[in-house]
Amino acid sequence: MGNESGEWIMHGMNWDNPDCIHSVDEAIKYINEFGFLPLFKNDIDGFSLEERTVPEYWWSDNPEIDPWMWRAIIARRHDIVYGKFFDKKAGFISKKWLPVFANYRRDGYDFDALYDDGKAPNKHKKIMVNFMENNADSEIYSNELKKQAGFGKDGEKGFDGAITNLMMQTYLCNCDFKKRVNKRGIEYGWDVAVYSSIEHIYGYDYVTSCYKDNPQDSWKQLVDYMRKMYPEARDKQIRKILK
């Protein structure tokens, strides 16, 4: 998705193109086969879900053909993780590749150790305590998490930025998108992001299974794979999207 002369333009392909992704199941298959994929177009041509779908079907509110709705379905199924993983923008990581990303992005640190070593700010700690120890399997609405973590008018600032940073470090993901529920148990409003730890999706042992490797070796594995799959991509472009 690009802004051209003040107008947002979607980039994609025709329905009858043999490379076109037509359904959420096809999207899941493609992501699992490739391993990871940004949601929207970026500096590497072809490396996004957007560019492999029909532009006119985005935000059509038809789950059969709307890629914007697919992202919520994929997040909800807990087979592939979804979040802001690519240059602080949204995308998907398969179960196969998640440990490699986690080892590199976390530099081999669990969050509590990262914080204890002075490498994470207190505002991140206030968010993460809601997903650690007895809260390890929590799934929390964005608006509720903001309150629980002490963000708001008279509290911490920069909630959205903190969430994005924790996703980039692969500590959190979007595990669902749901409508809020009022006191009478009735859903209302727009769908709201629901967050969880990535360990909640895949389990601690699996997520940390590459901790035994040097984080720079995991980085090299990611870069070498991208060079193989997108040989035309420049190193600068690869670093930008994967750092």
Where on the chain are the PLM-derived regions?
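Long, low-complexity intrinsically disordered regions
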Residues: M1-K243
